[in-house]
Amino acid sequence: MKNRHGLMGLVVALLTALSMIVAAPQAQAANRDWLRPDSTGTCEWDRVGYWVQRCTVWSPAMGRHITVQIQPAQRGGNAGLYMLDGLRATERTNAWVQDVNAARTFVNHNITLVMPVGGQSSFYTDWNAPATYNFNSPVTYKWDTFLSKELPAYLQRHFGVSPTNNSILGLSMGGTAAINLAALHPQQFRQVLSYSGYLTTTIPGAQTALRLALLDGGLYNLNAMWGSIFDPRRYENDPFLNMGNLRGRDVYVSAGSGTPSARDDRYLPQHKAAGIALEMVANFTTRLWSAKATATGVKHTAVFTPVGLHNWEQFGYQLNRSKPQVLNVMNAW
């Protein structure tokens, strides 16, 4: 009898272990293999693959549906990683999907990627007035409201992302915006990363540079964003001036030197020239930001590479370099 009971116990133990082995990949797939509801019906599979869904989220603030590319966490974790685009963001796809395939980078990890589509020249902020000079077809930008209020509610309901357990990163314009959003909404973002962002926006010459960049990026009106040079909103949205709110958060800032490397050989001469100039400015402003942060006790990681232009070679490198820091802080391995 004892031997029989012992044999049955062994069989039960083996079956239990086998069920756990089978259940693990099923649980992982279960969070990813079904399309969530969205504001126009149901999300769609994105052609990039890697479980990315294209979802539309209604924005009352902007009066339209916003497309967001979302890769659910592998095992249903509640951490989110918001990934912001650059100045020339398109309405087709978030560049983090298209240019470096961030979905492939994080496919084996327990964090939900949140990649909003659109927002060209927006700095992901709430604009005071219609964004362009085309008054016959006004563009309403209320990206801060969307990213901090409207989108989190959707993500929590349909993807299980906590409104208070998020990281946010961005490149160039998106790096500036990521620092600002993390400072303005410290309860939402535990971590922020800026890759080649412009982290001082009100020093002499910065406003002129921004004005020219917005005009070049689609005839956007700088005064419609944060008002005139005398408007307090210009200073409230300067990463150099609002860094105090980042105390207690994990902060990562980076920039290249503007010196080309062999990785940049594939770029056309005019694109390399622009990449040199833009990255040198990003490097200068990020160093200023880092120096002040150090002096005022804002803990952060600063990475300045000896080579690197303002392009996807640099942005992709920084994403992969900082990936372990994201996963460690967000407990999302």
PLM region descriptions:
Residues 10, 14-17:
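Gram-negative bacterial Sec-dependent N-terminal signal peptides
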Residues 6-10, 26-333:
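Non-catalytic cap/lid and distal C-terminal segments of serine-dependent acyl enzymes
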Residues 1-4:
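N-terminal secretory signal peptides that target proteins for export/translocation
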Residues 17-26:
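C-terminal segment of classical bacterial N-terminal signal peptides
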